[in-house]
Amino acid sequence: MMKKISKVVLAVGGTGGHIIPALAARETFIKEKVEVLLLGKGLTRFLEGEPDVLYYDIPSGSPFSLRPNQMFSGARQLYQGYTAALRMIKSFAPDVAVGFGSYHSLPAILASIRKRIPLFLHEQNVVPGKVNKLFSHFAKGVGMSFSAAGEHFRCRAEEVFLPIREPSEQIVFPEASPVICVVGGSQGAKILNDCVPKALAYVREKHANLYVHHIVGPKGDLEGVSRVYQDAGIQHKVTFFEKNILGVLQASDLVIGRAGATILNELLWVQVPAILIPYPGAHGHQEANAKFFTQTLGGGTMILQKHLTEESLRKQVLLALDPATSENRRKAMLDAQKNKSFKSLYQFICESL
């Protein structure tokens, strides 16, 4: 018999790769009549237009820096966040806490352990980050976006399903074919903004009705990217951010982007093939994600950033747009999606208590 919970703390912060899954998990808990408190840092821009979210921004710092001044500064901020989280958790009295990775989740995770609140984790990537790997030793269980991450945990670990952001409207491009979406993650990716438009200018020579929806990120050169497409005669829309990302993905024939776990889950959901250029930092997490997506699942191809050129990308785009190649990749993704778990994080937690 599953135990029920009535209150949960979600420890989260950092980039969209951690925050978006946490917000998706929040929706799952809310549907089960569970009261949710978000503790972390950096969520404000993701919560615009969401007045009913219970969220407190608390200090956080990384204890992993090798530079003494940064290490001490990070430790001080971490302690400040920890004491703030202790107060919040004491007042809120949750049944469980769930950490979503990144050092921004540390204050609430540590406070939960101190208060003897049962701890669970959610791992978005194929290879876990430092925080989740370390604190899995204190956790009752880990819910994973991809089952391949399970080999890194000794505690109970299962693949769980998080709801995908529903499209706010269906998007159709009746006069365009093919449609390519370019997305560099929540932070954008300068190298993609520089290289991809120039490569696609050559692709248009074989695909005259090409349409590109390019998301440059918050610091991207919107005008510069638009100018390249305009000069090449490519139909396009360039934006800093896209709230209706699933609607755009559903309307696309191909996606070019980074290999964050969130976008890969969305691609699997809509079965759209991709060319992935994984971010070379973050301890190789995105490269592992990209290998899993392209080699194990068969959903596309990977180009390492050090090998990315206009010519290498042009060749891969033309290959990906070949009807037979595209159909094979879509079929592989459909098969992979059929095999994914539909157990919710809420259900996994209740079963594990």
UniProtKB/Swiss-Prot annotation:
Pathway: Cell wall biogenesis; peptidoglycan biosynthesis
Keyword ATP-binding: no
Pfam families, per the entry: Glyco_tran_28_C, Glyco_transf_28
Subcellular location: Cell inner membrane
Keyword Aminoacyl-tRNA synthetase recorded: no
One CC-aspect GO term: plasma membrane
Major site of localization recorded for this protein: membrane
Cross-referenced CDD domains: GT28_MurG (cd03785)
EC number: 2.4.1.227
Membrane topology term: Peripheral membrane protein
Binding site for UDP-N-acetyl-alpha-D-glucosamine: 15-17, 125, 165, 186, 286
GO molecular-function terms, A-Z: UDP-N-acetyl-D-glucosamine:N-acetylmuramoyl-L-alanyl-D-glutamyl-meso-2,6-diaminopimelyl-D-alanyl-D-alanine-diphosphoundecaprenol 4-beta-N-acetylglucosaminlytransferase activity; undecaprenyldiphospho-muramoylpentapeptide beta-N-acetylglucosaminyltransferase activity
UniProt keywords, alphabetically: Cell cycle, Cell division, Cell inner membrane, Cell membrane, Cell shape, Cell wall biogenesis/degradation, Glycosyltransferase, Membrane, Peptidoglycan synthesis, Transferase
Catalytic activity annotation: di-trans,octa-cis-undecaprenyl diphospho-N-acetyl-alpha-D-muramoyl-L-alanyl-D-glutamyl-meso-2,6-diaminopimeloyl-D-alanyl-D-alanine + UDP-N-acetyl-alpha-D-glucosamine = di-trans,octa-cis-undecaprenyl diphospho-[N-acetyl-alpha-D-glucosaminyl-(1->4)]-N-acetyl-alpha-D-muramoyl-L-alanyl-D-glutamyl-meso-2,6-diaminopimeloyl-D-alanyl-D-alanine + UDP + H(+)
GO biological process: carbohydrate metabolic process; cell division; cell wall organization; lipid glycosylation; peptidoglycan biosynthetic process; regulation of cell shape
Membership in a protein family: Belongs to the glycosyltransferase 28 family. MurG subfamily.
Function recorded in the entry: Cell wall formation. Catalyzes the transfer of a GlcNAc subunit on undecaprenyl-pyrophosphoryl-MurNAc-pentapeptide (lipid intermediate I) to form undecaprenyl-pyrophosphoryl-MurNAc-(pentapeptide)GlcNAc (lipid intermediate II).
NCBIfam families in the record: murG
Name recorded for this polypeptide: UDP-N-acetylglucosamine--N-acetylmuramyl-(pentapeptide) pyrophosphoryl-undecaprenol N-acetylglucosamine transferase
Organism: Chlamydia muridarum (strain MoPn / Nigg)
Gene: murG
